[in-house]
Amino acid sequence: MVAARVSEVKAEGVLRGACAALAAAAALLVGLSTQTETVLLVRKKATVKDVQALWVLAMAAAAAAGYHLLQLLKCFYLGRRVGGGASPCRRSSRALAWTCLLLDKACAYTTFATTVAAAQACVIALDGAHALQWTKLCNIYTRFCEQIAGSLVLGMLAAVGTAVLSAASARNVFRHYSPGTYAAH
């Protein structure tokens, strides 16, 4: 039983490390993407701050990466503690499991929502909005748009990984409630 728990903690640690790396890569790729082009004799620079949804994505992805790194430290601690044979207090581990579940859900929803919002803003930059007389920006800033597209893929992969982690957190919560715990005596 202890060996199975240790392998679960290790698997969670690997997945958290992957999510942290994906979210950090998405944040860095969005945050550091710039391109300068000359348009009608005027030099224009495209940055992440030009589209507020991209700025929000960069901040949310950075926060998600930090959260996953903190949870990864928790996995290392629990892996050492469970591997050493120590058994944490049942009530405090139940509260910790609930806290991790709620934080994982919040991180998954936030990462997914900001990535989708940034993707929606990028569709307007890709196709333009003729009714509003907005031109296609990706024809001008091709490299910038390609970098943003890459960061959107990384952000979505991080969101999917976080959703899988929240399912594992839910399983961890329900493990604390055995069928005999609340049976009528």
Swiss-Prot record:
Signal peptide: none annotated. InterPro entries: CASP/CASPL (IPR006459), CASP_dom (IPR006702). Keywords: Cell membrane, Membrane, Transmembrane, Transmembrane helix. It comes from the Eukaryota. Disulfide bonds: none annotated. The keyword Cell membrane applies. Residues 1-12, 74-105, 169-185 are cytoplasmic. It is found in: Cell membrane. The chain crosses the membrane at residues 13-33, 53-73, 106-126, 148-168. Its main location: membrane. GO terms for cellular component: plasma membrane. It is a multi-pass membrane protein. Residues 34-52, 127-147 are extracellular. Belongs to the Casparian strip membrane proteins (CASP) family. Homodimer and heterodimers. This is CASP-like protein 2C1. It comes from Sorghum bicolor (Sorghum).
